[in-house]
Amino acid sequence: MRVAIVGAGLAGMATAVELVDAGHEVELYEARSFIGGKVGSWVDGDGNHIEMGLHVFFGCYYNLFNLMEKVGAKQNLRLKEHTHTFVNQGGRIGELDFRFLTGAPFNGLKAFFTTSQLDTKDKIANSIALATSPIVRGLVDFDGAMKTIRDLDRISFAEWFLSKGGNEGSLKKMWDPIAYALGFIDTENISARCMLTIFQLFAARTEASVLRMLEGSPQEYLHKPIQEYLEQRGTKFYTRHKVKEIKTKVTDGETRVTGLIINDGVETKTVTADAYVAACDVPGIKNLLPENWRTQWDFFNKIYYLDTVPVATVQLRFDGWVTEMNDPAKRKQLEQAFGLDNLLYTSDAEFSCFADLALTSPADYYRPGEGSLLQLVLTPGDPFMKESNEAIAYRVLKQVKALFPSAADLNMTWYSVIKLAQSLYREAPGMDLFRPSQATPIANFFLAGSYTQQDYIDSMEGATLSGRQAAQAILANQARLQTAVLASQ
């Protein structure tokens, strides 16, 4: 069977791996000049690796880890200390420290009860809310708890948290930075389902809250091994190939896709296959679907109710080590990297999470004779979309120095700003109902992408899981697809 996949992000590539392993022929068509989708990265003219986000691998990314192991990329992950670190104004560090003698759920209870990010009043309120949450049920009935959590999609996390005895202090100091890091929106705007899904996994599984980051850039250490695995098995990648139109035919009342009209910048051609997968993000799928499908099928019309959130990713290079707060000599020398080697959160800046990539992912980001390369995610990104890159860089620099007063005498030597007006889908309350399944009303047309139905959030894991589910839907209908192709010949 021949399958054409539109989109070479993680969802598209995960779909391809499953299909190729089952013995099928796959081609991927990507409109951009690089693969990877929202996890994509590239090298600029000066040799700097540029990313569109800060990519952290939680221990509960089981599907992504399985994919990475299969293609030989799992060894490219660097394990971080089992603690979630918050940097507050003035350089005060707060932690959710999951390191403990025993595993889940006790390490999680210890982390939240002893966190230095919250004062005593906030910790008590936080404990009350968590103690009355579905997370407790999940310790003995994981599937039942997950069903309860799915039903909480109708309300925001803040609404749920406050109704259970939580307080505003906990939301502001701890939960908002985490929500921004996960979904690019705060706890008043993110679904309770989204947040509680993550923390259900954290509570039930010791490894779920462990953090890892890539050895270097996503292109070199994640996408390249997947691409090589697929190409070694006959898969073809076509970048700069934009789908202009989906061709269809109605036979005996059934609509089927008969081809894709694709432009490569030089010529337009028609690609045919037995099955077609649209592995797009939300704006991509809205642009791809034929307009008449909206009126003909409510399944497709629901997709247009999904919205996205803007985000800006900023990289700042320094002439010293910004997160080394204790030793001035180490901070200013450039012979060795020093500082906080982990994902960092903050509630005191316009960026919710950040990391020094020269420490966390040194293969492509550490440069001899240079210092920190901070990568920071500005959320919500709305205020920055019309601002100049230079203004954004210096605005962020000022906030970095407020978090790290010890770095006041360090200089920014280079910056990059990447804006995405439409990034993750907005996981607002009530939106789960509009997420489509991977199988569609059109028998030979399938969807993949982290916005589609899958039991996780919009993330690298969600994208990978959606791709696996799309492939499973195709394989489950293989006989029907091949019969239809023979009948049309």
Curated annotation (Swiss-Prot):
It is an enzyme of class 1 (oxidoreductase). The keyword Cell division does not apply. Keywords: Carotenoid biosynthesis, FAD, Flavoprotein, NAD, Oxidoreductase. It catalyses: 9,9'-di-cis-zeta-carotene + 2 a quinone = 7,7',9,9'-tetra-cis-lycopene + 2 a quinol. Its cofactor is NAD(+); NADP(+); FAD. One of its GO terms (biological process) is carotenoid biosynthetic process. Belongs to the zeta carotene desaturase family. NCBIfam families: zeta_caro_desat. This is Zeta-carotene desaturase. It comes from Synechocystis sp. (strain ATCC 27184 / PCC 6803 / Kazusa). The gene is crtQ.
